[in-house]
Swiss-Prot record:
Active-site feature positions: S363 (charge relay system), D483 (charge relay system), H514 (charge relay system)
Class of the enzyme per the UniProt entry, highest EC level: hydrolase
One of the record's GO cellular component terms: cytoplasm
Protein's recorded name: Xaa-Pro dipeptidyl-peptidase
Function: Removes N-terminal dipeptides sequentially from polypeptides having unsubstituted N-termini provided that the penultimate residue is proline.
EC code(s) of this entry: 3.4.14.11
Alphabetized GO MF terms: aminopeptidase activity; dipeptidyl-peptidase activity; serine-type peptidase activity
Record carries keyword Cytoplasm: yes
HAMAP family: Aminopeptidase_S15
Cell compartment(s), UniProt: Cytoplasm
Keywords attached to this entry: Aminopeptidase, Cytoplasm, Hydrolase, Protease, Serine protease
């Protein structure tokens, strides 16, 4: 598998020497060293676990330059040069590879080439030797980290603890901070909100992890993760909303309105500051933050209103949530007051922070990054938003229907608010908050309107995209192309806005579902983020803006292949329109004339079968007779060459329904029995990545070829028939009358291999996402007025 590397910054020899000397790897007087002595010195420096010269000398015998000579014996010969094979046999051993198991002595560079590991052809003098070691230190080891990070995990950089300054290597910050002395403290930031209606502004508990060196005058940036889950969650799966019910007449919609909570102006900072008096008991919960904390970046967590240690009630997705989370950045920037405890008597400032803040986090944590970025809050320099919601309507609704995130049937805004209302765990807080919490829950249940599923002012207040013009910070979005929890149109739609803005922006799309990507084999994402944060938050010019393409997309056939694109949109491909035939085929010249019908039975058979939603979906897309019966399927011939679908497919369907209401679902599926990638990354080296020195670990993982399957969902979408004219306004419809639907599917970037077919499936009830009616309904599709349009690359 290829260990692709994008974060290595090309560096001239003089700068290589400077950096190597700065980390005590290369002797300052290297010019007077002979080749043999310098080679021995550099190899021994790389053996970071050996702490004395005697121990390092003993270790040399554990390495071999060939199938008949150890490194120790080779050095005894006082060589004046080293062959490429000899050098990289040793290099691969330093990188954690095992001879005879991973590679052969006879061809180390062949192995490196196959795995996208860099190497130099000529190592015949001291200068070339130094450059070879510089590149080796920046080469990804078997555990996915560069060798320098592997050495850090063995204690190499403890020699610099206490020096009270950052150090950089190849444009990235290195772990020279004493992780045994990390300051872990809690403060309380005052907001301008009163969501619990007690007449006082809500306080937000903020947990800070920062280098001890900041107590000695060093100012550092902060990586802030706004996590409503940080204080714990209240499990409520058994109280999910019932989805086994008939569809309602959507004209009952009454456009529920959003109303902001009371404003209570917070105190202004008075210029005084005392140290925090409460120690943090929660641990940092995000490996990327921990990794950067060892490299000098403070890690800050806050759950915002309603979470444990904070005042207020949860109002999922509302402006109040955004405002309370943004208040933390205002404090870090010096613009808002915080106290040492909840008595509000002693102020404390973030005088250790340099005023530059970045944000990290996935899912809800990524969502709040988008929300806060739209406020243009001062101090926020960059966001790295993973699997984020850009409109809560697009999370819980679609085209006039109630739609569940994957594996969350029956969940909604009110239940997510309950899940995150962790301040109810503290008895004193419970007594104060519970009555206001109950009122807010009642409001959320009423206004989210599960009855009709329609867009409203309530949902408009939760659409961050409509405030995108407030974004001032640089931008990185990360999303899984197979994320059916936070569906891909959330990132696609915000990207279409961000890409037109002047600030620097990047997009990563991986093959996962609702997953992080910082520890994948196929890309050095953590190193890229190190480079990025150093540039954005420390102001170091390190070529970060030019280091990798604007859009990086992981291939769905080969996990170690990343497509480098200028954008993600329909413009990447050529428009193609496919039409169904009366015989169930799908062609560009299809000429279907018939009216084909199917009868949807809602969730009745699904409930009887007792299978999971994911099992149903696989059987359904494969064409299992029982589950495919309530649908129409149209298939292409086998593709004769690989074809990539890019952007958002669009479907047009002329349909009538036997009832004056209905829902239509459409799926695009790849058919063909073959090995496909695992749905989630496989763990390859559990706990194999050290985040610092004895400072936590992460696990190397990657998507790998799995057992053969018959089909793979590419994309899908759903629509309420009563929105045939307007996605934001329902109309009454008549039974047995045809209506034209025109809607977009989830965006994708999917390669159909030669030998596979493409299927268009038209159906109604999606057992995992839509409501599951208790009554039968017959749908008739007019094939002459039905088509699927997408863009091929």
């Amino acid at each position: 598998m290829k260990y692709n590397q994008y974060a290595y910054v090309e560096t001239d020899f003089q700068q290589q020497v400077k950096e190597l000397i700065d980390i005590n790897f290369l002797p300052k007087n290297y010019q007077v060293w002979d080749f043999s002595s310098l080679l021995a010195k550099l190899v021994k420096n790389a053996i970071a676990e050996a702490k004395t010269d005697a121990a390092k000398n003993a270790k040399l015998a554990e390495f071999a330059v060939s199938d008949h000579q150890t490194l120790a014996d080779f050095l005894k010969e006082k060589p004046t040069e080293i062959g490429t094979k000899q050098f990289y046999n040793v290099a691969l051993q330093l990188l954690g590879y095992h001879v005879h198991y991973d590679y052969d002595f006879a061809d180390p560079t062949g192995f490196m080439q196959r795995n996208a590991l860099p190497f130099l052809q000529d190592i015949s003098d001291n200068q070339k030797l130094i450059s070879a070691f510089y590149r080796l230190l920046n080469t990804r080891a078997k555990n996915g980290q560069i060798l320098l990070d592997v050495m850090a995990g063995k204690g190499y950089f403890t020699q610099f603890w206490g020096q009270n300054k950052f150090k950089f290597f190849n444009g990235k910050s290195i772990p020279v901070f004493d992780t045994n002395k990390v300051i872990r403290e809690v403060v309380y930031v005052e907001t301008d909100l009163d969501t619990d209606h007690d007449g006082k502004s809500d306080l937000i508990q903020v947990t800070v992890f920062r280098p001890e060196e900041t107590n000695k005058g060093l100012k550092v940036p902060a990586l802030y993760t706004a996590s409503p889950y940080f204080g714990g969650i209240i499990a409520n799966e058994k109280r999910n909303h019932n989805v086994d019910e008939n569809l309602s007449d959507s004209t009952e919609w009454n456009d529920p309105q959003y109303v902001h909570s009371p404003i209570v102006k917070a105190e202004k900072p008075d210029g005084s500051s005392r140290p925090a008096t409460e120690e943090a008991v929660h641990k940092s919960s995000y490996p990327l933050n921990e990794y950067m904390l060892a490299r000098g970046f403070a890690s800050v967590f806050a759950g915002a209103i309603g979470t444990r240690g904070s005042d207020g009630v949860r109002i999922t997705g509302a402006p109040e949530e955004t405002e309370s989370a943004a208040a933390v950045i205002e404090w870090l920037h010096g613009d808002r007051v915080a106290y040492t405890d909840r008595t509000r008597t002693v102020q404390t400032t973030a005088d250790w922070c340099n005023g530059n803040i970045g944000m990290t986090g996935r899912s809800y944590l990524g969502t709040l990054q988008i929300a806060i970025a739209t406020t243009g809050v001062k101090g926020l320099k960059t966001v790295v938003s993973e699997a984020a919601i850009s409109s809560w309507y697009d999370y819980y609704r679609e085209h006039g229907l109630v739609i569940a995130p994957e594996a969350c049937q029956g969940e909604d805004l009110d239940l997510l608010a309950e899940t995150c209302q962790s301040n109810l765990w503290d008895a004193g807080s419970y007594l104060k908050i519970k009555p206001e919490y109950d009122k807010m829950q009642k409001q959320l249940r009423e206004k989210e309107d599960r009855n009709t599923g329609q867009y409203s002012d309530f949902w408009e207040a939760r659409n961050y995209r409509h405030h995108a013009d407030g974004i001032k910070c640089s931008w990185i979005s990360v999303h899984g192309l197979n994320d059916w929890n936070v569906k891909p149109k959330n990132v696609y739609k915000i990207w279409q806005l961000v890409k037109k803005m002047p600030m620097k922006h990047h997009l990563f799309l991986h093959q996962g579902p609702h997953y992080n990507m910082n520890n994948l084999v196929s890309i050095d994402f953590t190193d890229l983020m190190n480079l990025w944060f150093v540039h954005e938050l420390l102001g170091i010019e390190n070529n970060a803006y030019n280091q990798w393409p604007t859009v990086m997309i992981q291939d769905n056939l080969q996990a170690d292949k990343w497509h480098e694109e200028p954008d993600w949109s329909n413009d990447l491909g050529q428009e193609k329109i496919y039409y169904p035939t009366d015989e169930g085929e799908l062609f560009q010249d299809g000429n279907g004339k018939a009216q084909k019908s199917f009868t949807d039975v809602g969730g009745i058979e699904f409930k009887k079968a007792g299978i999971s939603e994911s099992d149903w979906q696989y059987k359904f897309i494969c064409g299992d007779e029982k589950w495919a019966k309530p649908s129409l399927r149209f298939e292409t011939d086998e593709f004769t060459h690989p074809t990539t679908i890019v952007g958002r497919p669009e479907v047009k369907v002329r349909v009538s329904a036997s009832l004056p209401k209905g829902e239509i679902s459409v799926a695009l599926v790849e058919l063909g029995e073959r090995q496909r990638l695992t749905a989630t990354p496989k763990f390859l080296m559990h706990g194999g990545q050290e985040l610092g020195y004895r400072f936590g670990t992460d696990t190397l993982q990657e998507f790998v070829p799995d057992k053969k399957t018959k089909a793979k969902l590419i994309t899908k979408a759903h629509m309420n028939l009563q929105n045939f004219k307007d996605m934001k306004k329902p109309e009454a419809i008549d039974a047995d009358k045809f209506y034209d639907l025109d809607f977009l599917l989830q965006p994708t970037y999917y390669t159909i291999p030669s030998g596979s077919k493409l299927a268009l499936i038209i159906y109604s009830t999606d057992q995992g996402m839509t409501k599951r009616p208790l009554e039968d309904e017959t749908y008739t599709i007019d094939l002459a007025n039905t088509e699927i349009k997408f863009y091929e690359k």
